[in-house]
Amino acid sequence: MSRKDYRDITLTEFRELKSVPGSIVVDVREKWEYEEFNEGGLNIPLSEIREKRPLLASYGNIVVVCTNGTRSRVAAMDYCRIPEWSDKNIFHLEGGLLEAE
């Protein structure tokens, strides 16, 4: 079985991709961080990504973001390990939302 990889994307690519049908943005920051500033999408803190996977099952493109890219990289790697998600495209916002502020 081959290992699935995620793809790093730029802020420009992120803003284009989040409007593509079948795409979902997953912000893995804590709720208070999300409430301070966000670029939309679904807020699922990193500690909850495994239990909330079913919320993402219907999407083909999953774009994971956080403040600086560290937590979102962990989440993207975790999502790539799900055998049932081999047909999904996993994206990671390189540099995080600091680039957007």
Please tell me what each predicted stretch does.
Residues 65:
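Short, surface-exposed ligand- or partner-binding patches at beta-edge/loop junctions that are enriched
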Residues 1-23, 28-61, 70-101:
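Rhodanese-like catalytic fold shared by cysteine-dependent sulfurtransferases
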